[in-house]
Amino acid sequence: MILVLDFGSQYTQLIARRLRESGIYAEIVPFFESIENIQKKAPKGLILSGGPASVYAKDAYKPSKKIFDLDLPILGICYGMQYLVDFFGGVVACTNEQEFGKAILEITQDSVIFEGVKIKSLVWMSHMDKVIELPKGFTTLAKSPNSPHCAIENAKIFGLQFHPEVIQSEEGGKILENFALLVCGCEKTWGMQHFAQKEMARLKEKIANAKVLCAVSGGVDSTVVATLLHRAIKDNLIAVFVDHGLLRKNEKEKVQAMFKDLQIPLNTIDAKEIFLSKLKGVSEPELKRKIIGETFIEAFEKEAKKHHLKGKIEFLAQGTLYPDVIESVSVKGPSKVIKTHHNVGGLPEWMDFKLIEPLRELFKDEVRLLGKELGISQDFLMRHPFPGPGLAIRILGEVSESKIRCLQEADFIFIEELKKANLYDKVWQAFCVLLNVNSVGVMGDNRTYENAICLRAVNASDGMTASFSFLEHSFLEKVSNRITNEVSGINRVVYDITSKPPGTIEWE
């Protein structure tokens, strides 16, 4: 196992992800992790991440000096390398020769860390300070146009000024793999088949004959959680699906069919009427979210009580992922609220359940791989993200049954055409928004004054930033023609070309 000490870089999670993609398990801890906890984890090597600070700043982030007493291989990346240089007596300075973006790395000295790596390759830079003078005993391994010491080494200690974890660094994955395998002596033992077997055994032991309640949203995370639990504890799992009437077209039927194929009993609650009645007259986005969250809890509580009367429920399952865990102990300090599944926050006190989070060690891409290992269909696993409040936040203004039907039909057409054109898997997320505005149109010889629909499609890797998708005009024209001809009440279609930032992916 490789342990990554997080100094606040926006790329820290990528380090662990790249290593895991190579079959090497990696964990992330804050830079101030105690030496006792580091020793308990028994890593075979340490990676010091990048960070936004300068090593010579008064409040510069610094780990325990005792990490050097562990006699472990260490790799410093960007700030991590500069910290190593400063700690061992070298010179780091702020110059006018900052580097951001792509640069050419040229290897000047053979090293095990560069085994099988091209002499010249593209790398990703993001630094203002640079190493001016190496500490005694260190050797320069590579350079870039603005960094004479772009990679350094001293026995088992290495430094890289660039970010190997970023996809733009052509040989970055290989370099990280070399450090883990050739320097640290790790083995490729990490994978979803191994994880599934290990986690099911752990769940069986922990839960024994107790009952577990699991809220199913129809999304990937909750479906994978339910499937993993059912494999481990069979009918002691109580899976609950609340249909709030704000789902995509045919969504309920798809979820029910999926769970039937997986042979998992699913308790479906039809709560459409109560949700719509509580949303009547409400236009403000945050109030809509609040009402949906509270109403979900009421519906979930009612169903949970039924099962609780039949036999005490001891556990509640949630789809917490590893990024949520990392954020809760980041270098910014523990979060005030640990992010949880939108459906299960704020449960009443009588639901005094023990928490089970089977996916808390996994990144989103690993959850999909686990789902595949568990036999969940690829089409389902690769579906675009869908918000917890559903179509309520894609209908601007008040929500009504007629608006929901209108949006469902338009959205169905957009997604259907994306799939026909083999574009669905090429965009990160795509959907329609029903705008709270009417416009004048002409249908035949008649004047119309009807709703406008906005098409939204974005490219992203994790949703933190996104750019709008460049869809061909002919494709957009086809979608527009179908929507205006097939969906009653729509006479205008527009395409959103806003990136994030400055906009958000969802409109509300």
Swiss-Prot record:
UniProt pathway: Purine metabolism; GMP biosynthesis; GMP from XMP (L-Gln route): step 1/1
GO molecular function, one term: GMP synthase activity
Keywords: ATP-binding, Glutamine amidotransferase, GMP biosynthesis, Ligase, Nucleotide-binding, Purine biosynthesis
EC number: 6.3.5.2
Residue span, GMPS ATP-PPase domain: 190-383
Top enzyme class: ligase
Amino-acid positions noted as binding ATP in the UniProt annotation, renumbered to this chain: S217, G218, G219, V220, D221, S222, T223
Catalytic residue positions: C78, H163, E165
Boundaries of every Glutamine amidotransferase type-1 domain copy: 1-189
Cellular component, GO annotation: cytosol
Catalytic reaction(s) noted: XMP + L-glutamine + ATP + H2O = GMP + L-glutamate + AMP + diphosphate + 2 H(+)
Role noted for this protein: Catalyzes the synthesis of GMP from XMP.
HAMAP family to which the protein is assigned, alphabetical: GMP_synthase (MF_00344)
Summary of subunit composition and partner proteins: Homodimer.
UniProt-listed PANTHER family: GMP SYNTHASE [GLUTAMINE-HYDROLYZING], GMP SYNTHASE-RELATED
Protein name (record): GMP synthase [glutamine-hydrolyzing]
Organism listed in the record: Helicobacter pylori (strain Shi470)
Gene coding for it: guaA
